[in-house]
C-alpha cells in the first residue's frame, strides 16, 4: 500500500457524481443503478459496486430523477431542474453536480457500469495532478468513454452555456472544451448494463 501511494504521489481531492437519471427503457423502466448484479463474487446494487470502486471521494453526489429516497442513503441527490422537460440527459445531471461539488475536481461515472476496477480513477487523478488539465476522459484504446471523466469546476460556465443553446451531446461538449484522453488497457471495465441478459 505504501509503495502504491509513493508511485501515485499526492492525488487531488475529488467528489464523485454517479449519473442515475436515465429512463432504462430496455429494463421496463426500472431504476437500473439500484438493480443487483454479481461482480467479482459480490451481488449488490450497481451503484454500490461503483461507489466501492471509486474509493476516496470527499463527497458523493447522485443525479437522479426518481427513487430519490433510496439514493439519499448513499449520498447527496440532485435532480434535473423543473425548467427541463422530461430528463435532460447526462449533461444536465453533470451541471447540477458541478453546482454543489465540494471539491475542485468532480469524478463522473454512469450508474450502469458496475464492473469498474477498484481505484480505476487514480489514473485520471494522477494526470490531473501532473498536468492540471480541466477535462480528462477515460479511453479504452477502442473509444472514448465520454461519461467516465474528471472535471475541473472551472468548466461549469462552458457546460451551462452549451446546454442553454439546446445541446445535449456529451461527445460534442467534450470536443468543444478540448478534453484530454487518459488511456486504460482494460476495456471490459466500462461495460454498461442495458438489458435483462446483462444482469445475469
Set out the residue ranges of the language-model regions.
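Nucleotide and nucleotide-moiety/phosphate-recognizing core
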Residues: 4-167, 172-191, 196-197
Amino acid at each position: 500500500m505504501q509503495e502504491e501511494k509513493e508511485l501515485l504521489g499526492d492525488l487531488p481531492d475529488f467528489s464523485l457524481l454517479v449519473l442515475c437519471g436515465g429512463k432504462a427503457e430496455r429494463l421496463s423502466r426500472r431504476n437500473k443503478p439500484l438493480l443487483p448484479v454479481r461482480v467479482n463474487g459480490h451481488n449488490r446494487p450497481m451503484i454500490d459496486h461503483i461507489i466501492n470502486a471509486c474509493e476516496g471521494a470527499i463527497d458523493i453526489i447522485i443525479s437522479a430523477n426518481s427513487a430519490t429516497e433510496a439514493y439519499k442513503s448513499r449520498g447527496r441527490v440532485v435532480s434535473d431542474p423543473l425548467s427541463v422537460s422530461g430528463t435532460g440527459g447526462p449533461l444536465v445531471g453533470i451541471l447540477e453536480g458541478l453546482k454543489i461539488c465540494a471539491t475542485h475536481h468532480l469524478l463522473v461515472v454512469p450508474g450502469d457500469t458496475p464492473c469498474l476496477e477498484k481505484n480505476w480513477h487514480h489514473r485520471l487523478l494522477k494526470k490531473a495532478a501532473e498536468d492540471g488539465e480541466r477535462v480528462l476522459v477515460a479511453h479504452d484504446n477502442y473509444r472514448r468513454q465520454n461519461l467516465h471523466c474528471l472535471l475541473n469546476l472551472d468548466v461549469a460556465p462552458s457546460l451551462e452555456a452549451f446546454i442553454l443553446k439546446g445541446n445535449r451531446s456529451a461527445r460534442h461538449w467534450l470536443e468543444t472544451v478540448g478534453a484530454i484522453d487518459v488511456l486504460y488497457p482494460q476495456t471490459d471495465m466500462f461495460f454498461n448494463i442495458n438489458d435483462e441478459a446483462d444482469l445475469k
